[in-house]
Amino acid sequence: MKKHLLAVAIAALAASSAMAQANDTLAKVKSSGSITLGVRESSGALAYTLGDGKYVGFHTEMAENIVKDIQKQVGAANVAVKYQPVTSQNRIPLVVNGTVDLECGSTTNDLNRQKDVDFANTTYMEQVRIAVNAKSGINDVKDLNGKTVATTTGTTSV
């Protein structure tokens, strides 16, 4: 019973912390009149740059629609949108330190990241694959033992 109460208390504390962060962000947007979107420059159809500070893609457009809702929530006639390019390596730290208010890229929602940031509902799922030379003899992930593998820092692809 005590463990159950402790679990409920921890869950309530986590929920109140997330709500406080959301309220802090809304207050920041209301007082500054702007919001900063963390955008990927080359994340396939989800988020990419057209150059000259213009960003498009499924998640970018979704975030811009969220900004319209935020604008209504804070009672602002207009909320200026600033775009901050982010990478796999810096996207989570920039949300945590407040440089970015909302990141709109191809970021995996996992338990480790949930310790630092809150996620919206999942909107896209994919499966990571590997590519090797057909003559390499590598047919499965276990065949990579002892081999050099390249990946991007800050991703969940490995």
Residue ranges and their predicted role:
Residues T36-A45, Y55-Q71, T108, E126-V158:
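Bilobed "Venus flytrap"/periplasmic-binding protein-like clamshell domains
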